[in-house]
Amino acid sequence: MKVKKLSGKVQDAQQIPTLFDNENITYHPINIVNWKEYPYQPQVSFRIAYTNDAILVHYKVVEDSVRAKYGEDNGSVWTDSCVEFFSIPAGDGIYYNLECNCIATILLAAGSERNLSLIHI
């Protein structure tokens, strides 16, 4: 997959879908279930681009039902209906984990793959 670089800055996350539409950034499906014990598979796709100072990701999710229990950042959002983004952008072994539930509560952590520390937002 080739990730497109966009010029300029995004001032508000709500601008991302329109910006991606205008730049013809396409959706990519996520159609793999990694855990046998959790066979449920919602319909998920994403599109991604970057700027000089940001990685921009837009998810589209269709589920049978949703859960949104956690409203405080760095809470247990992974137990809610959520999406995740993992990256090692500098190739230095520092692994970033970003999780967001369906009410925009964020969990952000960084570190080695087995030793993540929360980043206060």
Tell where the protein language model's regions lie, with residue ranges:
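Conserved small/polar residues in nucleotide/adenosyl-binding loops
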Residues: 119-121
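Surface-exposed, glycine/proline- and aromatic-rich loop segments on solvent-exposed faces
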Residues: 27, 33-112
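Polar/acidic, low-complexity leader/linker segments enriched in S/T/G and N/D
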Residues: 1-24
